[in-house]
Regions:
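Conserved N-terminal beta-strand and adjoining loop/helix that marks the start
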Residues: 10-13, 18-41, 62, 93
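Short loop segments at secondary-structure junctions
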Residues: 36-39, 47, 111-116, 130-132
Length: 159
């Protein structure tokens, strides 16, 4: 899957090397775009104790050492929102340069899952459709929302 350009979030905030002067490490994150048959998709808020707390995003989380994107997505969605997902389809990969981290986002479409949504980290959630009305949106989520408006609904690549 080809990575797109780097999005610089909050360019007015400083970045740079880590404490030893080395370039920042890239954090890989699996992101699930859960879509219902009616075209609505799930957004959750980031927990208040994390960077960008309260911002809306697609659910997901960091890959652990040795995990594939799909394995991480399955684990994170079970841990964070209490569901077990079916097939995950790779959609796109974006790099986002946040002031606190350099993040590679692996976006996957998920069309089926089992279990009831349970926000285990105190998040809020909403089923919404395009154009998105939730606000504020996490900067790394904005390009994907715009892209989703222009991609066919049946666009899938197996993860």
């Amino acid at each position: 899957m080809t990575q797109r350009n780097i999005l610089v979030a909050d360019p007015q905030h400083s970045r740079g090397a880590d404490m030893e002067g080395k370039p920042r490490t890239v954090v890989n994150v699996a992101v699930g775009i859960l879509m219902r048959a009616d075209g609505h998709y799930l957004l959750t808020t980031r927990p208040s104790d994390k960077d960008y707390g309260g911002y809306w995003e697609f659910p997901g989380g960091k890959l652990e050492i040795g995990e594939t994107v799909e394995q991480a997505l399955r684990r994170e969605l079970q841990e964070e929102i209490g569901i077990t997902i079916g097939q995950a389809y790779n959609l796109r990969v974006d790099m986002v340069d946040y002031p606190h981290a350099l993040v590679r986002l692996h976006f996957c479409k998920v069309l089926d899952w089992a279990g009831e949504l349970t926000m285990r980290e105190g998040q809020d959630f909403v089923w919404t459709q395009l154009p998105c009305q939730a606000s504020p949106i996490l900067p790394g989520t904005l390009p994907v929302l715009a892209w989703l408006e222009n991609v066919p609904a049946d666009h899938n690549d197996a993860a």
